[in-house]
């Protein structure tokens, strides 16, 4: 399935074919993870989940990279529970789970590198958005030619953004970068 920028998601059914470099497959894997870690949305994102496409594509990329199946086993298992489900019900359930995992003063999972590092260094109530770790990530991305859009108001070091950036680097940093 070709890249569909209007969806922000692309399939990789042909990834095992000849002519795909390891970097291409690695870039695809990172982009799939970026999509999977973004906040759940109606439309193409949830359709990729309930159709099973997201789980299949992650499994194919993982196999093409010769990763241990255990590397994405739990993630794939979680995604597969929504396969064939009603999209609206699945979206509601996934949003509830996202809130449980990532939101609040003491989230189960820290989805921002800067706040995760602050907690690792003993900061009880880390500052989100602007902290020295997040600024370092933004500076590194800028050195690589990736600059956030003027009105971008999310943490640049959210996992989904960093996965997207790793995909960009795996592709050789040659993708067109929005100004």
For the regions a language model picked out, list residue spans one by one.
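Intrinsically disordered, low-complexity segments enriched in serine/proline and basic residues
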Residues: 1-12
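Surface/interface-facing alpha-helical segments and adjacent flexible terminal/loop regions used
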Residues: 11-179
């Amino acid at each position: 399935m070709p890249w569909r920028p209007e969806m922000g998601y692309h399939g990789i059914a042909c990834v095992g074919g000849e002519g795909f470099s390891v970097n291409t497959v690695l870039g695809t894997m990172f982009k799939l993870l970026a999509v999977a870690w973004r906040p759940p949305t109606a439309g193409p994102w949830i359709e990729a989940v309930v159709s099973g496409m997201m789980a299949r594509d992650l499994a194919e990329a993982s196999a093409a990279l010769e990763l241990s199946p255990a590397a994405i086993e739990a993630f794939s298992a979680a995604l597969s529970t929504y396969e064939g489900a009603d999209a609206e019900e699945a979206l509601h359930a996934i949003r509830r789970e996202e809130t449980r995992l990532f939101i609040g003063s003491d989230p189960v999972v820290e989805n921002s590198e800067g706040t995760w590092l602050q907690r690792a260094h003993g900061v009880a109530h880390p500052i989100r958005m602007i902290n020295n770790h997040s600024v370092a990530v933004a500076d590194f991305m800028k050195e690589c030619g990736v600059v956030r859009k003027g009105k971008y108001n999310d943490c640049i070091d959210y996992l989904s953004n960093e996965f997207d950036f790793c995909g960009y680097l795996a592709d050789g940093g040659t993708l067109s970068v929005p100004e």
